[in-house]
């Protein structure tokens, strides 16, 4: 049995292995970031850190999610960083048996390598996503994560790091 979080995006059932998920949180409106990929909604504060939030509908289907009360943010780990995936709703944690999994035939290829496999259920087909491949090669997202990492390290700086000509800078940005 394999535990997965099943959720909806564009009314399609999608899933991620539970070990890839840090937490599921209530939807909150992200602060927009200029000049990022169209599927990056912005950032929120999560566990005292800045968390980029991705509109999964926009990433997968090219259409923005219409905001509503059932929306959630799934916090996942990608490339040693955390991302929030905005989804329409959460179906729940489901145990899938190995007989439910179906991989693609060698003759049939899925152009998008972020589809890990298909899962057959009584209510239809669930697409298991490969979170590691979902944003692979996205330069804008990589730059955003690097900028957030830099900002995180800037939080650790002390007053001594902010001097002009060896003089501390006061709160009005005037050298003393």
Model segments located where?
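An acidic, low-aromatic, low-complexity terminal/linker signal
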Residues: 1-176
